[in-house]
């Protein structure tokens, strides 16, 4: 079994000052385009979410009839299109369904679908551990 360990990242919080969050620097790719991006590892997110600019960089295509709205915590709905991309975590690359946001103001989220069933993911002592 192999492990990839990411230290939590310290970030500013309006409520708590400094907090440590589970962020993993992962490679996301589509065809010949790839980018190293900091994803929040979010066990509460159904899908992996990427902002409009990243999907555009990856050459994802918009189809008006495929736009749907998703909603997380809070009342705001976000228009997205579901697409496939590859994510590499350590030495393992998997294809995942991503929700490509058609707005920019969304965080990069690594959600459960296609990810959590390919890895054992452990949140422990300010570290995120991926085992495969």
Model-found features: residue ranges?
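Pepsin/retropepsin-fold aspartyl endopeptidases
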Residues: 1-132
